[in-house]
């Protein structure tokens, strides 16, 4: 069981590093006038595909269905 926790933290850390590596810098509203005003100012559209993967990894490591 203790190894599952180690792998969990390793996967989370590696995904965080991937996001920091490939994340685009937050654009200012002046640079993108067509941006939605409702969008979060620091939202990263490249991170959206990672969210379902993280959920599946966490549920698999924690033994949940």
Curated annotation (Swiss-Prot):
Its main location: secreted. It comes from the Eukaryota. This is Vespid chemotactic peptide VT1. The lineage of its organism: Eukaryota, Metazoa, Ecdysozoa, Arthropoda, Hexapoda. The modification Leucine amide is found at residue 62. Expressed by the venom gland. Residues 24-49 form a propeptide. Keywords: Amidation, Antibiotic, Antimicrobial, Fungicide, G-protein coupled receptor impairing toxin, Immunity, Innate immunity, Repeat, Secreted, Signal, Toxin. Residues 1-23 form the signal peptide. GO terms for biological process: defense response to bacterium; defense response to fungus; innate immune response; killing of cells of another organism. AXPX repeats lie at residues 23-26, 27-30, 31-34, 35-38, 39-42, 43-46, 47-50. One of its GO terms (cellular component) is extracellular region. Belongs to the MCD family. Crabrolin subfamily. GO terms for molecular function: toxin activity. It is found in: Secreted.
């Amino acid at each position: 069981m203790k190894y599952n926790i180690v792998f969990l933290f390793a996967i989370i850390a590696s995904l965080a590093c991937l996001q920091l590596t490939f994340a685009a810098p937050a654009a200012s509203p002046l640079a993108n006038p067509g941006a939605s005003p409702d969008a979060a100012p620091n939202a990263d559209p490249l991170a959206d595909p990672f969210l379902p993967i993280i959920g599946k990894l966490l549920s698999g490591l924690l033994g949940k269905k």
